[in-house]
A protein has these predicted regions:
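Hydrophobic anchor at the beta1->P-loop junction of P-loop NTPases
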Residues: 11
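P-loop (Walker A) phosphate-binding loop of NTP-binding proteins
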Residues: 14
Length: 199
């Protein structure tokens, strides 16, 4: 019997919906690999280069683009200037050997689906009630040595458009996972993963 191909489980949702916490728990509890994305934004406190992101400057992005290795790239005009987030074909993915867990945006999910094929990607859309999400974002930003409240507000408003119901439907995302209760959300995600492949 032929071995099942791996999947790319694509975790996405609005900012402060709990994606990072769910991601860490899933990585600890399941034999999944990750695809570390790239960004031109500065490191946040507690982040490490090569763990959450590969932090490269604009010159690094230009070099990878010239080499034709960019799978998808999004650039946001922040109050601190343009910040790009992107995925690179750098040899991290081998679906014949493993399944992967990735955090990304709806836009990046669509581009990854076009690159790897729809059968390889499984969307996991996380949501939290907006008031709770805003409070979580504010609490997290207060912990930064230099809080960026204007950027927090920009992200919150941009998420409303980026993850609209219409855009989710157009991307073929029909299931969502409430993260009001992290344990329940984690259980539901694991059930989906088990159905999709043996992880």
């Amino acid at each position: 019997m032929e071995k099942n191909m791996g999947k790319i489980f694509y975790l996405m949702g609005k900012s402060a919906s709990g994606k990072d916490t769910l991601y860490r728990r899933l990585m600890e509890e399941l034999p999944l690999r990750t695809i570390v994305p790239y960004t031109t934004r500065p490191l946040r406190e507690g982040e490490e280069n090569g763990r959450e992101y590969h932090f490269v400057g604009e010159a690094g992005l230009a070099r990878l683009r010239a080499q034709g290795r960019i799978i998808e790239c999004r650039t946001y005009q922040t109050v601190h200037g343009p910040w790009s987030y992107f995925t690179v074909d750098d040899g991290q993915v081998n679906l014949a050997q493993a399944s992967y867990l990735v955090i990304g945006t709806l836009e990046s999910y669509i581009k990854m689906q076009q690159y790897y094929g729809s059968e390889a990607l499984v969307p996991i859309y996380i949501y939290v009630e907006d008031g709770e999400r805003l409070q979580r974002a504010l609490n997290r930003e207060r912990l930064q040595s230099v809080p960026r409240y204007a950027e927090l507000c920009r992200r919150f408003l941009a998420d409303e458009e980026d993850f609209s119901g219409e855009k989710l439907r157009n991307a073929g995302i029909t299931r969502s996972y409430s993260n009001q209760d992290a344990e329940c959300c984690l259980k539901n995600i694991k059930e989906t993963m088990k159905i999709e492949c043996e992880v």
